[in-house]
């Protein structure tokens, strides 16, 4: 059975959207992982009684002021939170479009039978 051109087009859009949605979800997951790591690092630094901490830079550890490192990490956390929020919004919009396309395809396939 040959599918009509509009159904083939919708099917291609559906497959492309599915791939894009998977990429968005993967990227969001990566940022969420980084965010948790940063938050854990800040938490561990706060437990430390020392005013200095060691920071990894290019494969070596460098002694740094704890307050400066905490500020850097806090800024990074803010950036990551913003990115995660952006990806959540994109994911939500794509998921809605995905569901709409899926329903349209199911209707079109049902009518063709």
UniProtKB/Swiss-Prot annotation:
Compartment(s) of residence: Cytoplasm
Domain of life per record: Archaea
SUPFAM superfamilies linked to this entry: Prefoldin
Annotated GO biological process: protein folding
Cleavable signal peptide: none
Alphabetic keyword roster: Chaperone, Cytoplasm
Chief location bin: cytoplasm
Molecular-function GO terms, alphabetical: unfolded protein binding
Cross-referenced Pfam families: Prefoldin_2
Gene Ontology cellular component list: cytoplasm; prefoldin complex
Quaternary structure annotation from Swiss-Prot or TrEMBL: Heterohexamer of two alpha and four beta subunits.
Stated family: Belongs to the prefoldin subunit beta family.
Role, per record: Molecular chaperone capable of stabilizing a range of proteins. Seems to fulfill an ATP-independent, HSP70-like function in archaeal de novo protein folding.
Name by which UniProt lists this protein: Prefoldin subunit beta
Native source species: Methanococcus maripaludis (strain C7 / ATCC BAA-1331)
Phylogenetic placement of the source organism: Archaea, Methanobacteriati, Methanobacteriota, Methanomada group, Methanococci
């Amino acid at each position: 059975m040959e599918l009509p051109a509009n159904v083939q087009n919708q099917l291609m859009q559906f497959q492309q959207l599915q791939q894009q949605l998977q990429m968005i979800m993967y990227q969001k997951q990566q940022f969420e992982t980084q965010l948790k790591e940063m938050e854990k690092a800040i938490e561990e630094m706060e437990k430390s009684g020392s005013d200095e901490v060691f920071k990894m830079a290019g494969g070596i550890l460098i002694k740094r002021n704890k307050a400066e490192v905490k500020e850097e990490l806090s800024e990074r956390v803010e950036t990551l939170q913003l990115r995660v929020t952006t990806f959540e919004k994109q994911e939500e919009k794509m998921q809605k479009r995905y569901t709409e396309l899926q329903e349209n395809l199911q209707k079109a396939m049902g009518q063709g039978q």
